[in-house]
Design a protein with these regions (language model features):
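Catalytic machinery of carbohydrate-active enzymes
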Residues: 1-354
């Protein structure tokens, strides 16, 4: 059997598909199991995964329609027998990709935006469930293949190499961070749709870091992120002592993971790095409530502390659903909702956690 797992939404969603990938291998040990991802960081997360044969990576949106179609058509030659669109790929583009690739069995969840056209693109469908985590929604597809749960437990899986672990240790040694208590912070969020609006304000992060440097000088703060966060990192670093706070300069997502693994605590909104922190079992994980957070995308299999947002107040599904669209609300409303989480609330949570 040849199976293709399509997981082309967020980078974190790739990580949320790893329990399904492991179950597929447990159920079909002799199958060829490949994955198709959108982002290079998604490929990084699946590199070295022993349950996969290959990982295909292509940004279909950036490639443009002709190039995207040519790429998907080239995958038809693989003659996959089954394709699985992992949760929560609500946009029709991903089901169209499955149809072009052409596996006879094409599995997907149905979403709020699911219609007659979608039923022409995929042929085995089950409803998504907002009361259950994305990992569990993914595992629900197994009976559609005549399969079931074979593993005694499930976890987000990332397989770092000894060289990557060594690199992280050398980074700490070179930056005089070995043996220090480390707090990782990710100031960013997804850049598609209007997901940048769920970021906690930069000014709040600046005030928080200054206060931590002043009142918790034993902590060493590492700022994680990619090119999109570079400007924010520079704004924070310009106001604080360099020996207490620094940028985690990594070349790829796997180095980021290896370095995050050394952290004692991690702070973010719901992002790919939030899911990565859960996968790495960082001892103290703190999540600021944003309008996209709901039961389906909490940190999976890992305890965390939520800094509650007085505006969102557990009503994430009123703001964001898997309907192919962005966060509901005006730019001003969403920015104000995130500004409503005070620096004092986050500092107090951090102080009690580390």
């Amino acid at each position: 059997m040849k199976i293709l797992v399509i997981t082309m939404a967020g980078i974190g969603d790739v990580l949320l598909a790893t329990p399904l990938i492991h179950e597929l291998r447990a159920n079909f040990p002799d199958a060829t199991i490949d994955a198709l991802v959108r982002w290079p960081a998604g490929r990084d997360l699946l590199d070295n995964n022993p349950h996969l044969n290959r990982v295909h990576q292509q940004d279909l949106v950036q490639a443009g329609k002709p190039a995207a179609l040519r790429y998907l058509w080239s995958l038809r030659s693989e003659r996959y027998e089954v394709s699985i669109n992992a949760h929560p790929q609500s946009q029709r583009l991903y089901r169209l990709a499955a149809r072009v690739i052409g596996a006879p069995v094409r599995i997907s969840h149905s979403y709020d935006c699911f219609g007659a056209v979608d039923r022409l693109l995929v042929n085995r469908v089950l409803p998504q469930d907002y009361t259950r985590h994305t990992v569990e929604n993914n595992l629900d597809v197994l009976p559609l293949l005549g399969a079931g749960l074979k593993l005694p437990a499930h976890a987000l899986e990332l397989f770092l190499t000894p060289d990557e672990e060594k690199w992280a240790d050398e980074f700490l040694a070179e930056n005089r961070l070995a043996g220090q208590k480390l707090l990782g912070i990710h100031v960013g969020s997804g850049g598609t749709k209007n997901l940048r609006l769920k970021r906690w304000p930069l000014g709040h992060y600046q005030e928080l870091v200054r206060r931590l440097n002043r009142e918790r000088p034993e902590l060493r703060i590492l700022l994680f992120g990619g090119p999109e966060e570079k400007q924010d990192h520079q704004a924070i670093l310009a106001q604080v002592p360099g020996e207490l706070t620094r940028e985690a300069k990594t070349r790829n997502f796997r180095q980021t993971a290896a370095l995050m693994k050394r952290c004692h605590a991690f702070l973010s909104v719901d992002t790919a790095l939030m899911h990565l922190a859960a996968a790495l079992k960082i001892p103290a994980q703190i999540v600021i409530e944003a309008p996209t957070l709901n039961v389906t995308n909490w940190p999976y299999g890992h305890s965390f502390t939520l800094v509650k947002n007085p505006v969102i107040n557990g009503r994430g599904l009123d703001y964001y659903r898997y309907d192919g669209g962005g966060i509901k609300g005006t730019r001003e409303e969403l920015l104000a909702s995130m500004a409503a989480v005070s620096v004092e609330d986050v500092y107090r949570t951090l102080r009690s956690s580390i």
